[in-house]
Amino acid sequence: MITESQTRAAASIGVPVARRHIFLCCDQTTPKCCEKERGLVAWDFLKKRLKELGLSDEGGILRTKANCLRICEGGPVAVVYPEGAWYGECDPPVLERIIQEHLIEGRVVREYLIEQHRLGGA
């Protein structure tokens, strides 16, 4: 049974107003796509920039740290939904472009795009 506490937690992280959700492969149990430290640097940068830009929480961008996104090379790897855009080499400079161009402006960053497929076939 879903509790009121869970509903409040979802609201507090911005689920009701989310426009996009970025998952970043980092902090892996067994690092494969990149060194563990490299992934954690990318994660820390992503968290900091989304907060600085007012995009986290009620800002419409959800972020999730993933243990593994199953593309075990060229990492850190990220995926942005609802567009289903998969990105490689997601170090801070690339993440900055993804934040500015994709998360804010809605344009896929083709230079780092591995593959794109919107779920549901739309």
Which functions belong to the PLM regions below?
Residues 1-15:
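N-terminal leader/targeting and pre-domain segments
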Residues 2, 20-60, 65:
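Small-residue-enriched alpha-helical segments and adjacent helix-cap loops
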Residues 14-16, 55-56, 79:
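Solvent-exposed alpha-helices and their adjacent loops that cap or buttress functional pockets
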Residues 29-50, 74-94, 101:
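Iron-sulfur (Fe-S) cluster-binding segments and ferredoxin-like electron-carrier domains
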Residues 56-75, 83:
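Short, intrinsically disordered low-complexity segments
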